[in-house]
UniProtKB/Swiss-Prot annotation:
InterPro entries per UniProt: ABC_transp_permease, LivHM_N, LivM-like
GO biological processes: branched-chain amino acid transport; isoleucine transmembrane transport; L-valine transmembrane transport; phenylalanine transport
Function: Part of the binding-protein-dependent transport system for branched-chain amino acids. Probably responsible for the translocation of the substrates across the membrane.
Native source species: Escherichia coli (strain K12)
Protein name (Swiss-Prot/TrEMBL): High-affinity branched-chain amino acid transport system permease protein LivM
Pfam family of the protein (one): DUF3382
Mode of membrane association: Multi-pass membrane protein
């Protein structure tokens, strides 16, 4: 152990102790008209000391960690991709699908509800992966399309009484239209400028929903959004006025409130499977190759006779449609929508799913969505520090595997050693 490593560990621990002591060790209290600085509870100081110790030992043992991670990180370490190209992978995917269908009947109602939320984020991640991972366009306002889909279902049901299955394609079309219209002003923008424009779009949508109280309800939102039905059969104790019948009464079963949660999960699973099927089919079409060409080099893409303008428009439109479908499912799960559900934090969370999983890989998006959504739900008890913990996890992930958990495998052509030597000679 070199003295320099010990000194760096002590310095890092001291800096952490000072910063954590300021943000967590003290608290402001209102005494009449004055703010009084007071020390925090002993529990918070315990966490400060624990964090200081963790930082010290991490910095002290960091060289050993780096040596150990070299074998399992970096571009040379590529986890096997699962794209269904072989018979074994197809059998594995079928087994996963069967397990996913049977799983909700063996767990609790709350677990199934969390799984449904995970499915929603998987659809969002797959949609954003089209424009960010496959096309190489940075979008920070994806929550705007998400909100359009959710409010389309909520408004059509509130004012016209339309159901889930009727509103699902309409919400997708509305979000796709918004993506198509957004594509025109951002066609010539790239990089940070494109990200800023899309960020502004997401905030504009949220503010419009917040201020238009006569139609959207403003901050109060829209409530009493119905759940999806099975060919008109409702998963409730009694059918609504004008409804056909309930699921339990039609089949002569005992009413179980878990049936509604399980059915919503199966609907979400169906939408995930359809999303994967559509995206994989698009990737095998010339459109998918055009997305990859745009991501690699826009100038080379134009020189090949491809139109970057049309490619961007298709990417924005298709990506927004998936967000609209996810928004409809979110509104059905919650039974209530409000503008506060579609802040920039939601867009950042979906972007984190795509980046941490591995841009361009569908299976990576699924894995990252499961890890991040479940981690966020488990950290509900640390509500004040959940985003801090999530940010720390992202930083560690970027240090360990900046290319993501399962980066997309790209075809490569390499010359053999003999051929390369012959050309050099």
């Amino acid at each position: 152990m070199k003295p320099m490593h010990i000194a760096m560990a002590l310095l890092s621990a001291a800096m952490f102790f000072v910063l954590a002591g300021v943000f967590m060790g003290v608290q402001l209290e209102l005494d009449g008209t004055k703010l009084v600085v007071d020390t925090a509870s002993d529990v918070r100081w315990q966490w400060v000391f624990i964090g200081t110790a963790v930082v010290f030992f991490f910095q002290l043992l960091r060289p050993a960690f780096q040596k150990g991670l070299k074998s399992v990180s970096g571009p040379k370490f590529i986890l096997p991709a699962i794209d269904g190209s072989t018979v074994k992978q197809k059998l594995f995917l079928v087994a996963l699908l069967v397990l996913a269908v049977a799983w909700p009947f063996m767990v609790s109602r709350g677990t199934v509800d969390i799984a449904t939320l995970t499915m929603i984020y998987i659809i969002l991640g797959l949609g954003l992966n089209v424009v960010v991972g496959l096309s190489g366009l940075l979008v920070l306002g994806y929550g705007g399309f998400y909100a359009i889909g959710a409010y389309t279902f909520a408004l059509l049901n509130h004012y016209y009484g339309l159901g889930f299955w009727t509103c699902l394609p309409i919400a997708g079309l509305m979000a796709a239209a918004a993506g198509f219209l957004l594509g025109f002003p951002v066609l010539r923008l790239r990089g940070d400028y494109l990200a800023i424009v899309t960020l502004g779009f997401g905030e504009i949508v949220r503010i419009l929903l917040l201020n238009n109280t006569e139609i959207t309800g403003g901050p109060n939102g829209i409530s009493q959004i119905p759940k999806p039905t099975l060919f008109g059969l409702e998963f409730s104790r009694t059918a609504r006025e004008g409804g056909w019948d309930t699921f339990s009464n039609f089949f002569g079963l005992k009413y179980d409130p878990s049936d509604r949660v399980i059915f919503l999960y199966l609907v979400a699973l169906l939408l995930v499977v359809l999303s994967l099927f559509v995206i994989n089919r698009l990737l095998r079409m010339p459109l998918g190759r055009a997305w990859e060409a745009l991501r690699e080099d826009e100038i080379a893409c134009r020189s090949l006779g491809l139109s970057p303008r049309r490619i961007k428009l298709t990417a924005f439109t298709i990506s927004a449609a998936f967000a609209g479908f996810a928004g409809t499912l979110f509104a059905a799960r919650q039974g209530f929508v409000s503008p506060e559900s579609f802040t920039f934090a939601e867009s950042a969370f979906v972007l984190a799913i795509v980046v941490l999983g591995g841009m361009g890989s569908q299976f990576a998006v699924i894995l990252a969505a499961i890890l991040l959504v479940v981690s966020r739900e488990l950290m509900r008890d640390f509500n004040e520090y959940s985003m801090l913990m999530l940010g720390g996890l992202m930083v560690l992930m970027m240090i360990w595997r900046p290319q993501g958990l399962l980066p997309m495998t790209r075809p490569q052509l390499k010359l053999k050693n003999g051929a390369a030597k012959g050309e050099q000679a």
